[in-house]
UniProtKB/Swiss-Prot annotation:
Pfam families: zf-C2H2_STOP2_3rd, zf-C2H2_STOP2_C. This is Zinc finger protein STOP1 homolog. It is found in: Nucleus. One of its GO terms (cellular component) is nucleus. Probable transcription factor that may be involved in aluminum tolerance.
Length: 522
């Protein structure tokens, strides 16, 4: 079994012309290929009696270098990453940026490993260490979240390269079928050399998983440029970060989706200001009482006689058949200069009367509703006030750059968009209760913060638009990818004794961290 796998691996490696020349220069003349010893055997080949490890469904042959030892990576991985050929059309990503991302992930994993190792060494000291252990657990959770997000972003940069199929090279196809097929398919089956060397790799660019991952990772260029331009250009080392103001506005109520209706296919109606701001739109013809909905008017009419109590009178009026063939009706904002006004060059019509009301109140009316909790934020639509009051007064979610968010999913969206940003921990959670325990707790936290080595370049932000990226609380929510086979599942770590959804991360003080190489002290 071992010799068979060894011969198959030698055959696969010798099939690459560029690898054959390098192997000839770096090995003895009598050696016919690269042999794997029992110590440096790649993880993709199992020893006798040992099951093969499960691989996450990573994309592309380039990802196979993540699972090879250093000596094999120097011979194989650099053929695809470090020396991109201008004649190779499949190399449409930057190898230097990829190496930088992998180095960042390596440092973060080493930091988490050091923290967990320190927790394991001090697990016997139960008395007086509960607050310190809880703070470390929060730090490990935040670091693992950052690692997973950065790993997904790194894998996403490789996805455009999959648009060019690799099946044109028989040797490369055979090597990828032997080493990377389980990683692409996400299976746990044994890796056996295929008898048919002409087997092709499935077109990942057409799969449902590929489309979902691309939709979740890629943000439009306009949104990225707008968010980058919102950074404070004057923010130096001594500048204080400006908290981001969270606007809980639902664009669907405002008719935010832009329609591409051809001209002449719809009729534009423009209501006056008085009609838009009128509290009632339906009135009783007998007593003159007004109502917001026609159903309330029908219920009111029952008090004016038995003829209004019949099923026909209480039923919702049926649509006139003649109106079905009528053109689509859209609405215009009466405010001159607004892009929703029909006189605007880039006119965007509003779909319904409700959209007209919400748009006009939000954009052109005074904000008369004030939050009773913070007494600072004002709204012109009562629904926006109620949405704001749901999270007002709670601890804000903070990023390492100092930007604050009212919701956790928006923080994670911000972290995924800007490289190097991570969720941060509050210093209040690190304080040790008790006067006798405080010196020991402070010293322990200083050691932990120093060993973690966090230091992010300070940056300010002004009204960065919220990236509404809905995420679940489960650590495997990021995409169809599953990281359990690679990381062993986040459940292997000791779960903190708090609810992540109710205890936000805050950030460590500036200047307490650095991504430099550590000395190895845990």
């Amino acid at each position: 079994m071992d010799s068979g796998l060894g011969r198959s691996s030698e055959t696969s490696l010798k099939a690459l012309p560029s690898m054959a020349s390098n192997a000839t220069r770096n090995t003895d003349p009598d050696q016919q290929g690269v042999r794997f010893s029992s110590m440096d055997q790649p993880p993709c080949f199992a020893r006798p009696g040992q099951s093969f490890p499960a691989f996450p469904p990573l994309f592309g042959v380039q990802s196979s270098s993540l699972y090879l030892p250093d000596d094999i990576e120097a011979k194989i991985g650099n053929q695809f990453e470090s020396n991109p050929s201008p004649n190779n059309p499949t190399m449409d990503w930057d190898p230097q940026a990829m190496l930088s991302n992998l180095s960042f992930l390596e440092q973060k994993i080493k930091q988490v490993k050091d923290i967990v190792q320190s927790m394991s060494n001090r697990e016997s000291q139960v008395a007086g260490g509960s607050s310190e252990a809880q703070a470390k657990q929060q730090l490990v959770t935040a670091d693992l979240t950052c690692i997973i997000i950065q790993l997904i972003s790194t894998a996403g940069s490789l996805l455009p390269s999959m648009k060019n199929p690799i099946s044109s090279n028989p040797a490369l196809r055979h090597l990828s079928n032997t080493l990377c097929a389980p990683m692409i398919l996400g299976t746990n089956c044994n890796l056996r050399p295929s008898a048919n060397d002409e087997a092709t790799i499935p077109d990942i660019s057409k799969t449902h998983d590929y489309e979902e991952l691309m939709n979740s990772l890629n943000t439009t260029q306009a949104e990225s440029d707008e968010m980058m331009n919102c950074q404070n250009p004057c923010g130096g080392e001594g500048s204080e970060p400006i908290p981001m103001e969270d606007h809980d506005v639902k664009e669907s109520d405002d008719g935010g989706e832009r329609e591409n209706l051809p001209p002449g296919s719809y009729v534009v109606l423009q209501l006056e200001k008085e009609e838009i701001l009128a509290p009632h739109t339906h009135f009783c013809l007998i007593c003159g009482k007004g109502f917001k909905r026609d159903a309330n008017l029908r219920m009111h009419m029952r008090g004016h006689g038995d003829e209004y109590k019949t099923a026909a009178a209480l039923a919702k009026p049926s649509k006139d058949s003649s109106l079905e063939s009528a053109p689509v009706t859209r609405y215009s904002c009466p405010y001159v200069g607004c892009k929703r006004n029909k006189e605007h060059k880039k006119f965007q019509p509003l779909k319904t009367i409700l959209c007209v009301k919400n748009h006009y109140k939000r954009s052109h009316c005074d904000k008369s509703y004030t939050c009773s909790r913070c007494n600072t934020k004002k709204f012109s639509v009562i629904a926006d006030l109620k949405t704001h009051e749901k999270h007002c007064g709670r601890d804000k979610w903070l990023c390492s750059c100092g930007t604050t968010f009212s919701r956790k999913d928006k923080l994670f969206g911000h972290v995924a968009l800007f490289q190097g940003h991570t969720p941060a921990l509050p210093m209040d959670d690190i304080k040790v209760t008790g006067a006798s325990e405080q010196p020991q707790g402070s010293e322990a936290m200083n050691t932990m913060v120093g060993s973690a080595g966090y230091n992010f370049p300070g940056s300010s932000s002004d009204d960065i638009p919220n990236l509404d990226m809905k995420m679940a609380d489960d650590p495997r929510y990021f995409s169809p990818l599953s990281f359990d086979p690679c990381f062993g599942g986040l459940d292997d770590f000791t779960r903190p004794g708090f609810d992540i959804s109710e205890n936000p991360f805050s950030f460590l003080p500036s200047g307490s961290c650095s991504f430099g190489q550590q000395n190895g002290d845990s």
